[in-house]
């Protein structure tokens, strides 16, 4: 109980910080400081080590580099939950698993409905399938202890499965031309990490060094570099012996150490460099285009319809039960909150459209609007339900 309470408090603070940096990015992009903001995003950063040369603008270092650390953390969370947490049994995983599948299928179908026949636009079909766990849990934590713990666990489990789905989508659908040499180096790195895991090697620095080699090789391979973070996480031992012979969990220690860095530095920085939408160039006509409508309605309508609809079916068919001490309206309110795509949707958007501004920021504004509508509506639904409980 204390662990979950502490986690939710931290996510609440992180969510508030994400809002602040998003507003700051919007102000900078739409003021006399827009040139300085754009220049900051495209600041060249180079790394040379012998024959190795990596040169990218700051924006891509954040998206390819820092977000790999974020996905490393997600990988650690998934591993812990599957091995000993809320996803460790079929009974625990059934409802959030089915809900997560619905929350990916329905938004994707809505986007496809608006954009079928447009090959480039269709690259963005996965944008509305994502959920931003920091924001969604942040909204729940603002409602206090009156929201049943079972619903918070449901949302946490659903979000983790949702993130796992995003990882699979990135691996399958957002991979470019492959480099055989780089993939070979990545495979060798993974093999070494696997052997270290099986031999119970308990040296963090060894995993980090091999992990960096893995990241560089994946970056050069054509597979998105963030997947290196997930692969590395799955190779970190859940339990090892230290030099004194005592058992400890390297995976849990790394997860704990990274949480604050991810919540208060990496995700806010990602939001800052990606949420700077140029509102001056966006018209009502642009926002009524198939891509913005597919994204916005996919997030606000598709996510809640998919999560709640699939949950309702699973419960009515006897495959799962309603979370303890909750109601259908509470479950619906949480389902609406899953439409907060924000950072995850922005990330998929950057992959889908390769950071081009072909839609003149309308796609990104649609993400912000869909996420805001989901956050506000979900909060109000749960708030009214809370008041009803107070009165009773």
Curated annotation (Swiss-Prot):
The keyword DNA damage does not apply. It holds the Pfam family Na_H_antiport_1. The chain crosses the membrane at residues 16-36, 58-78, 93-113, 124-144, 153-173, 176-196, 199-219, 257-277, 295-315, 328-348, 362-382. It is found in: Cell inner membrane. It is a multi-pass membrane protein. Keywords: Antiport, Cell inner membrane, Cell membrane, Ion transport, Membrane, Sodium, Sodium transport, Transmembrane, Transmembrane helix, Transport. It catalyses: Na(+)(in) + 2 H(+)(out) = Na(+)(out) + 2 H(+)(in). InterPro entries: Na/H_antiporter_dom_sf, NhaA. One of its GO terms (cellular component) is plasma membrane. One of its GO terms (molecular function) is sodium:proton antiporter activity. It comes from the Bacteria. GO terms for biological process: regulation of pH. The keyword Signal does not apply. Na(+)/H(+) antiporter that extrudes sodium in exchange for external protons. Belongs to the NhaA Na(+)/H(+) (TC 2.A.33) antiporter family. This is Na(+)/H(+) antiporter NhaA.
């Amino acid at each position: 109980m204390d662990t979950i309470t502490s986690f939710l408090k931290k996510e609440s603070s992180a969510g508030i910080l994400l809002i602040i940096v998003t507003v700051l990015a919007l102000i900078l992009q739409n003021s006399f400081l827009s040139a300085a903001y754009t220049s900051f995003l495209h600041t060249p950063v180079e790394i040379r080590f012998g024959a190795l040369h990596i040169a990218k603008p700051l924006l891509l270092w954040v998206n390819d580099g820092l977000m790999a650390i974020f996905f490393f953390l997600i990988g650690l969370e998934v591993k812990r939950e599957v091995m000993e947490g809320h996803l460790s049994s079929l009974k625990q995983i059934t409802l959030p698993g089915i809900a997560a599948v619905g929350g990916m299928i329905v938004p994707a179908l809505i986007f496809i409905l608006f954009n079928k026949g447009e090959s480039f636009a269709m690259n963005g079909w996965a944008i509305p399938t994502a959920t931003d766990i920091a924001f969604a849990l942040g909204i729940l934590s603002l409602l206090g202890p009156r929201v049943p713990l079972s619903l918070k666990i449901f949302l946490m489990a659903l979000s983790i499965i949702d993130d796992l789905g995003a990882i699979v989508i990135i691996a399958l659908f957002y991979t470019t031309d492959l480099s055989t040499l780089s993939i070979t180096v990545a495979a060798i790195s993974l093999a070494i990490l696997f052997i270290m895991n099986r031999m119970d090697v308990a040296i963090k620095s060894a995993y980090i060094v091999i992990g960096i080699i893995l990241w560089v090789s994946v970056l050069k391979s054509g597979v998105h570099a963030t997947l290196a973070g997930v692969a590395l996480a799955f190779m970190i031992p859940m339990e090892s012996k230290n030099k004194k012979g005592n058992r400890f969990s390297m995976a849990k220690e790394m997860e704990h150490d990274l949480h604050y860095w991810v919540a208060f530095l990496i995700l806010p920085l990602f939001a800052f460099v990606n949420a700077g939408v140029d509102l001056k160039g966006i018209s009502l006509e642009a926002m009524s285009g198939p891509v913005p409508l597919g994204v916005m309605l996919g997030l606000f309508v598709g996510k809640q319809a998919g999560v709640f609809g699939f949950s309702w079916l699973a419960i009515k068919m006897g495959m799962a039960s309603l979370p303890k001490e909750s109601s259908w309206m509470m479950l619906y309110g949480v389902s609406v909150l899953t439409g907060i795509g924000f950072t995850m949707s922005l990330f998929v958007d950057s992959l889908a459209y390769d950071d081009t501004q072909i839609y003149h920021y309308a796609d990104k504004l649609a993400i912000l609007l869909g996420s805001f509508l989901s956050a506000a509506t979900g909060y109000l639904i749960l708030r009214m339900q809370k008041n009803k409980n107070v009165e009773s």
